[in-house]
Amino acid sequence: MDNDLLWIRKIITSCDNFSEDIDLVQVTAGPFGPIIDRIRERLSFLGEPRRSPKAHNFTLYYRFESEFPPMRPLHLKVETNTREHFIIGTQVKVPFSVNSKWFTESCEINTYSLEELLGTKLRALYQRRKGRDLYDLFIAMTLHPELDKNLLIRCYRKYMEISVEKPPERQEYISNLEDKMANAEFLGDTIALLPPDAQYNPVNAYNLILNELISVI
């Protein structure tokens, strides 16, 4: 599947927020059936998933129990974007490893450049009311000051253009985010996702993203 799928999100930005999702993108045009069969084969130890095919994505939902007491139900969502068959920046490989008493292995994972990942995240920040998008952008910008912001904005514009008929102007984006910053649900979105000792202030994140990115849209 190396040539067909790219991974997105937290494994690249080193964000420490918890997620029960695996997010993939099918970057080669063609039938998705063989790819989903391969994913199911690799995850067969989780049991048979519930499938949810849609026009532009295909999602597998797995439900299983934890392996140590107290036993509790867990779930995993594997969602693949089957629409955006292109890459703006450079495809990169990053190291990924698992080291636990159950399983130890390492590999390289295909993904987008960090700028392209964050371009899609900047789109998500406008389109949905989830404070985790602001958090992810803030952490990535803080950890990687060397980012090519021009490339990030170029990626944002491309992804926004294929998502909406009329991309927002700068002031529209600012007004959109100001409304969200006054929304308790948006501000509280990261509470259950971050470790208790996480030092995060959404107002600081808002100011950074506004000044560094949104101001140049």
What are these regions (language model features)?
Residues 12-16, 22, 27-217:
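Structured mid-to-C-terminal alpha-helical surface segments
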Residues 1-11:
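Short gly/ser-rich loop at a beta-strand->alpha-helix junction or flexible surface loop bordering the NTP-binding
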